[in-house]
Amino acid sequence: MTGQGQSASGSSAWSTVFRHVRYENLIAGVSGGVLSNLALHPLDLVKIRFAVSDGLELRPKYNGILHCLTTIWKLDGLRGLYQGVTPNIWGAGLSWGLYFFFYNAIKSYKTEGRAERLEATEYLVSAAEAGAMTLCITNPLWVTKTRLMLQYDAVVNSPHRQYKGMFDTLVKIYKYEGVRGLYKGFVPGLFGTSHGALQFMAYELLKLKYNQHINRLPEAQLSTVEYISVAALSKIFAVAATYPYQVVRARLQDQHMFYSGVIDVITKTWRKEGVGGFYKGIAPNLIRVTPACCITFVVYENVSHFLLDLREKRK
């Protein structure tokens, strides 16, 4: 009886969660993720190149963001700046779509039947849960993106390049490295869910406090400028707190180096490069992710409000 009771209770909990699922959040998240990453992909390429620059001879040497961009442009043109764009678009669109999808469902589930709003820690946990669920699905796409971005020596036009596209990369990684290869960087990626959790917690609280400050309803829709400001502040806070894990993950996924695991990456990076090694690429990352976050959240908020309003009108 106890087992049956637990099973029924679990089933009831899941059915309650699914009642709060809204496809509008998925569509809005995908829209925001795709548009922002398509616009700013070259800066993501620069960030990855800097994150893995550990002195290995085969890697190109860059003196800064502009030098990196111009060097890639001279060697490979526009296609070079968009190496790895296909898995990045798939990964970003799917990640943001699923993230908002899971996050809003979890958040709605937790607030059902409650008069009071969620606490800061509840926003944090909800976002972390959504991030972990999303990463389980999207990690292979991030490995693929990193591998494609780290092909050097004018590889865009080279017949000898190791990977020829997203699906070719996925197949080759699975063939030669198995499922484990597709999930390289998964552990630091899980730590990375703290980034999204911190960002969403800050974003929710900033929106709430701002609306309270100007005497508006807590759920009132903000203007575009207000969304941009709140999104930028929450992103900068999250990046500053969690950037080192991105360096660790990128180095684990790099096909030119072999590390036995997360501890090995941390130890070697610390020994050779010190604290600065864990923050390589943070400048291009901030330049990229702050506007990308603003685009994503502005598109998401406006598309989701539009679609959810349509749902209400159809009732």
From Swiss-Prot:
Disulphide bond pairs: none
GO cellular component: mitochondrial inner membrane; mitochondrion
Key word Nuclease present: no
Catalytic activity: FAD(in) = FAD(out)
Pfam families: Mito_carr
Compartment list: Mitochondrion inner membrane
Expression across tissues: Ubiquitous.
Keyword list, A-Z: Disease variant, Membrane, Mitochondrion, Mitochondrion inner membrane, Repeat, Transmembrane, Transmembrane helix, Transport
Membrane topology: Multi-pass membrane protein
Transmembrane segments: 26-43, 89-106, 123-143, 186-203, 227-243, 281-300
Phenotype when changing residue 260 to N: In NTD; uncertain significance
Entry annotated with the keyword tRNA processing: no
Stated consequence of mutating residue 128 to T: In NTD; uncertain significance
GO BP, one annotated term: folic acid metabolic process
Solcar repeats: 20-109, 118-209, 222-306
GO-annotated molecular function: FAD transmembrane transporter activity; folic acid transmembrane transporter activity
InterPro entries found in the cross-reference section: Mit_carrier (IPR002067), Mitochondrial_sb/sol_carrier (IPR018108), Mt_carrier_dom_sf (IPR023395), SLC25A32-like (IPR044712)
Effect of residue 71 to A: In NTD; uncertain significance
Cited function: Facilitates flavin adenine dinucleotide (FAD) translocation across the mitochondrial inner membrane into the mitochondrial matrix where it acts as a redox cofactor to assist flavoenzyme activities in fundamental metabolic processes including fatty acid beta-oxidation, amino acid and choline metabolism as well as mitochondrial electron transportation. In particular, provides FAD to DLD dehydrogenase of the glycine cleavage system, part of mitochondrial one-carbon metabolic pathway involved in neural tube closure in early embryogenesis.
Involvement in disease: Exercise intolerance, riboflavin-responsive: A riboflavin-responsive form of exercise intolerance, a condition characterized by failure to maintain an expected level of force during sustained or repeated muscle contraction, resulting in an overwhelming sense of tiredness, lack of energy and feeling of exhaustion. RREI transmission pattern is consistent with autosomal recessive inheritance.
The family this protein is said to belong to: Belongs to the mitochondrial carrier (TC 2.A.29) family.
Record-given protein name: Solute carrier family 25 member 32
